[in-house]
Amino acid sequence: MPIDTNTEVKAIARYIRMSPFKVRRVLDQIRGISYREALIILEFMPYRSCVPIRKVLCSAVANAENNKGIDPDTLVISKAFADQGPCLPRYRPRAQGRAYKIRKPTCHITVAVASLVDD
């Protein structure tokens, strides 16, 4: 069934303290499948990034339901991506008074849902 891009609704979580590479491996698994299936997959995946992704997905579905009046059972994840956010600098003390810089990466998670078109 084709996806209706006119009814696309999105939700964004910004400055999540997680590497975008680690978030993308989970988003690749749920892109293009239904909302209910994605919740089940996220529930049982062993990755830490599933928690913020699940929150963003539920927020996108709530936006579709409350703002556009779309039935959640017809929703499919049309877009899901993670952009790189700013890296937080931290310093690790080293020998002889030196310090190494440590990057603490952040990411912005975007999930868009759209309803299926009836043929």
UniProtKB/Swiss-Prot annotation:
Gene3D superfamilies linked to this entry: Ribosomal protein L22/L17
GO CC term (a single one): cytosolic large ribosomal subunit
One GO-annotated biological process of the protein: translation
Record's protein name: Large ribosomal subunit protein uL22
Lineage of producing organism: Bacteria, Bacillati, Cyanobacteriota, Cyanophyceae, Oscillatoriophycideae
Family: Belongs to the universal ribosomal protein uL22 family.
Gene, per the UniProt record: rplV
Keyword NAD: no
Organism, as annotated: Trichodesmium erythraeum (strain IMS101)
SUBUNIT field: Part of the 50S ribosomal subunit.
